[in-house]
Structures are given as structure tokens and as C-alpha cells.
A protein has these predicted regions:
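Alpha-helical transmembrane segments of multi-pass membrane proteins
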Residues: 2-237
């Protein structure tokens, strides 16, 4: 009986190793970290130089929108509503692209998403401050496409442009590890908190760059997306 259990355990371990080897570049920690850096950069950018509106943290926008609505400040409420709508539209478009090009052989559909996101953010760098609402909507649209396209890291769900879900999942995994001492749970903790850390670093860099460089600072996020796209192109080859 003991020998049979050991045999089953070895087979399961081998299967896990094979699955890890087959993980796509889009689900690796390195690419996820690059996307998180870019996501943090975007949020800091729109908050600092685009009228204190969040491009990624739509919960904050909903809170501020609701507050202004209750105060009868409808113009200010719309200021926060439009990025939320743009975020929803981005998810819709990304889902359609994923469905249409999921089986494409020449290019991975996630590469298409990253390429579109890069173009949008590059254009945003040219939009003057008088059109901040349009700029923020475009960043929110691009961000949500990224959120929709990149939802897994080493097989488990995560978010590259926000922290609350990662914080919950990481802390849950920490609790499991403290109770059961499972190495896989500790690995999840490292991945989730690592993504939170890289998001924070990206936000810090984005904040400093937006303060000193201004509107064109968003090109730093575009550069990170180029790197992400190159990694996926290399895998495709």
C-alpha cells in the first residue's frame, strides 16, 4: 500500500513539473511583473497629471463619482464616470479579440492586446492637459484590456493592474501555509506579494516620472509593454 502511494505521489509530482514546463510566457512571473510595473505606472500617471483620476482603480472612481452625485455636482461626477465606462468597454473589446484570434497561428491574441495598449498609451503622451478626460479614458480602456487578457500567473488567477485581489489571494495562501506547511502555498505567497511589490514600484516610478517629466511620462509604461510584447514574440518563434 505504501509503495502504491509513493508511486502515485511520484506520478503527480511529474505531472506538475510537466505542467510548469508548458506554462506560456504570458503566465510567467517575469511577464506578470513587467505588466504590474506598467499598471502601477499608469495609475500614478493619471492621478498626478490627469486631474487626480485613477485609470485602473475603478472602485475609487465609483466612490468619488457617487459622492459628487449626492452633492449635485454632476460635472465632477461625469469626470469619474467616463473612465469607468471606458474600462468596461476595454474588457468588452479584449474579450472579442480573444475569441476571434484565440486559435490564430501567426500571432498570439495577447500580443495583439499588448500592441493596441502600447499604441494607445503612446498617443496619450501627445494629448494636451486640456483634454485630460479623454486621456484618462484611453488609459482606462488600455488598462482594462490588459486586465482581461492577462488573468493567470503559473496557473492561478491574479490582476496586473490592481492590488486588492492579489492581497486577498496572497494572504489566503499565507494562512494555508501557516496551517498546513504546504510548499505550494508558500510559492503562491511569494508570487502574489511579489506582484504587489512590483506594482508599488511601478507606481512609485510612475509618480516621480509624471511629476518631473509631465504628460509624456506615460511613454515609460509604453516601453514596458514593448518589452512584454518582445518576450511573447520570442516564445512564438
Amino acid at each position: 500500500m505504501a509503495n502504491e502511494l509513493q508511486k502515485i505521489e511520484r506520478e503527480v509530482h511529474r505531472d506538475v513539473e510537466e505542467i510548469e514546463e508548458k506554462i506560456q510566457t504570458s503566465e510567467t512571473f517575469l511577464l506578470s511583473a513587467i505588466l504590474a510595473l506598467s499598471g502601477g505606472f499608469q495609475d500614478a500617471y493619471t492621478y498626478n497629471v490627469r486631474d487626480n483620476v485613477f485609470s485602473n482603480a475603478q472602485t475609487g472612481n465609483v466612490v468619488l463619482m457617487s459622492q459628487h452625485m449626492m452633492l449635485g455636482e454632476w460635472g465632477k461626477a461625469l469626470h469619474y464616470l467616463f473612465p469607468v465606462v471606458a474600462f468596461a468597454l476595454g474588457v468588452l473589446v479584449a474579450e472579442q479579440i480573444g475569441h476571434k484570434y484565440k486559435m490564430a497561428k501567426r500571432v498570439h491574441w495577447r500580443q495583439i492586446i499588448v500592441a493596441i495598449e502600447f499604441v494607445i498609451l503612446f498617443v496619450v503622451g501627445f494629448i494636451p492637459s486640456g483634454y485630460n478626460m479623454i486621456a484618462t479614458m484611453l488609459v482606462s480602456f488600455a488598462c482594462s484590456m490588459q486586465v482581461q487578457a492577462f488573468r493567470k500567473m503559473h496557473g492561478y488567477g491574479y490582476a496586473s493592474t490592481m492590488c486588492i485581489g492579489n492581497l486577498r489571494s496572497g494572504t489566503e495562501s499565507l494562512s494555508v501555509y501557516l496551517r498546513d506547511k504546504k510548499p505550494e502555498a508558500l510559492k503562491k505567497v511569494a508570487h502574489y506579494y511579489g506582484i504587489i511589490l512590483t506594482f508599488a514600484v511601478g507606481a512609485g516610478i510612475g509618480g516621480v516620472c509624471s511629476i518631473y517629466i509631465g504628460l509624456k511620462a506615460i511613454w515609460g509604461s509604453s516601453a514596458l509593454l514593448i518589452l512584454a510584447c518582445m518576450m511573447m514574440v520570442q516564445e512564438k518563434r
